[in-house]
């Protein structure tokens, strides 16, 4: 059992692929997600597709650079290879045009840099169909 992880989450471990040419980005996201998810990182689409033949991911975090280079065809190919997969594209927070473009060609959502642990985990949990705890401050007067 994983330390600090609820028993139910340990049982329902989901598979997440992180695809980015940048090693630091891959490592950071794997570190953030590894407690609650079976997380694999890849520098190339081909490496991820090969691994995905035997171990289909539930969710893919995909560098915007891959999407810009290969366009909607890439998203279509990933969905064909892995039916039901959720595709989230990693974008820069200040790139509103890039975010709009990847959403227009079929991404399920975006994950924006800079990354913060709790927002990243909440977004991933939401797309994996897990209950997301709302933290609403209550003021008693």
Please give the residue ranges for each predicted region.
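Conserved phosphotransfer microenvironments
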Residues: 58-78
């Amino acid at each position: 059992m994983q330390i600090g992880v609820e028993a139910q989450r340990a049982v329902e471990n989901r598979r997440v692929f992180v695809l980015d040419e940048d090693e630091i980005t891959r490592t950071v996201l794997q570190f953030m997600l590894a407690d609650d998810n079976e997380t694999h990182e890849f520098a190339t689409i081909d490496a991820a597709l090969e691994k995905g033949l035997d171990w289909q991911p539930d969710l893919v975090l995909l560098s915007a650079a891959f999407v810009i280079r290969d366009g909607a065809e890439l998203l279509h190919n990933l969905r064909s290879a892995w039916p039901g997969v959720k595709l989230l594209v990693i974008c820069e927070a200040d790139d509103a045009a890039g975010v709009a473009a990847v959403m227009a060609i079929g991404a399920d959502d975006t994950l924006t840099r800079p990354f913060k642990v709790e927002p990243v985990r909440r977004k991933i949990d939401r797309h994996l169909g897990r209950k997301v705890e709302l933290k609403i401050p209550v003021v008693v007067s």
